[in-house]
Swiss-Prot record:
Protein name per Swiss-Prot or TrEMBL: GTPase Der
Gene assigned in the entry: der
Residue ranges of domain EngA-type G in the record: 3-166, 200-373
Transmembrane region(s): none
Protein's organism: Shewanella denitrificans (strain OS217 / ATCC BAA-1090 / DSM 15013)
GO MF term list: GTP binding; ribosome binding
Keywords: GTP-binding, Nucleotide-binding, Repeat, Ribosome biogenesis
Residues covered by region (Disordered): 472-491
Disulfide feature: none
Keyword GTP-binding among UniProt keywords: yes
Protein origin, superkingdom: Bacteria
Entries under SUPFAM superfamilies matching the protein: P-loop containing nucleoside triphosphate hydrolases
GO BP annotations listed: ribosome biogenesis
The protein's assembly and partners: Associates with the 50S ribosomal subunit.
GTP-binding is among the record's keywords: yes
Amino acid sequence: MIPVVALVGRPNVGKSTLFNRLTRTRDALVADFPGLTRDRKYGRAFLSGYEFIVVDTGGIDGSEEGIETKMAEQSLAAIEEADVVLFLTDARAGLTSADLAIAQHLRSRDKTTFVVANKVDGIDADSVCGEFWALGLGEVYQMAAAQGRGVTNMIEYALAPYAEAMGLNRDDDEQAIEEEREYTEEEAEAEQKRLQDLPIKLAIIGKPNVGKSTLINRILGEERVVVYDAPGTTRDSIYIPMEREGREYVLIDTAGVRRRSKVHEVIEKFSVIKTLKAVEDANVVLLVVDAREGIAEQDLGLLGFTLNAGRALVIAVNKWDGIDQTVKDRVKSELDRRLGFIDFAKIHFISALHGTGVGHLYESIEEAYDSATRRVSTSMLTRVMQMSQDDHQPPLVNGRRVKLKYAHAGGYNPPIIVVHGNQVSKLPDSYKRYMMNYFRRSLKVVGTPIQIRFQEGDNPFEGKVDKLTMGQERRRKRALSHINDRKTKGE
């Protein structure tokens, strides 16, 4: 499962700067969720082959109110759910009482923690950073987040235990072959058959109180008492194996504390980190929306993270029973308006409480899974690419027609198609969208985003200036001299 890195420290030590550098953005992917701590920001990060979730926990000032009070609302939850904690300090300001208070709390937790002395640019870092050893958390790592100095080394060291799980210890050629496997027709069919026997990992996500608990209990059966999030299990989602009509599933449950008999009496816990990790680990995401509230900003935030992760998607509009036709029409209109950009996803109107429409979800879930994991041969992808050209020629670029040569698979979940050709980098976005839609229709891809990557046929001489040999240079000079002599005589 994708690791979570929490950035902890007092205000103005550079946590936001490091967050922005790691996520390559100035805005968190998922931020300011209603009902959640305003000071926590979440984002996906990619660095040196590592993929992880990074959390900016906000500043802790260690005031007289007590470190526990300050951390409980914002940073404590992030620390408990994180796999790695980066404790940032300010090398220029030196060791402070707030740093000592935070360190005392971190020592009481069984967490992998790294002390980072930030802002070491332009100072004698070795002499200044020595005092941070007094925090009692081991080695002190130097960094200048604003300039990027030491950031990559820090992440590589902190996440080294996860390298094998992420496939970073494999040979580069082996990894490239797996990512861009060129299947024959027979190999694609055999691989697809193998995938049919694997359980579908289904993450059920949604903002609090939209009915995730009720839906999960409906899926698992009325008689099943579900009590999760017992002490010690707060960090990870619960994985529940089940089977329906011969097809195996693994439900990834993020709903929080609940008991079937008291489902209406328990306020559902909501953990952003738990939800984001579940999305990353799933094959298919089932987003549950409350019909009575419509599409909220929090729904769009979860939807955005799902799309960025490239996961197959099914949307369930819950609590559809008991509302009049006028409200239903308004909700459908709002869905069309706000979710038009994900026209590939199936939308179901259900009642988890009464079971209405729940059975139809499985068909869309299996369809989305099959589309997201389907192996397609190189010959098939190339044929579809050629058909798209026959129906609609690529445009001219500088008087020359863009030429598409062949296509092959570049990855799955989401499906990635790599198209090779000449001048493909100059294709307009409109033609790229046309090709994406053409592949989707031709391959019957439903319920999952699809990515097309264009790879240029590199010209080895492009951008190079021919350098004359010494003999060629002498002949060139003689020729120029001869031309100049003729011009002089002609005058």
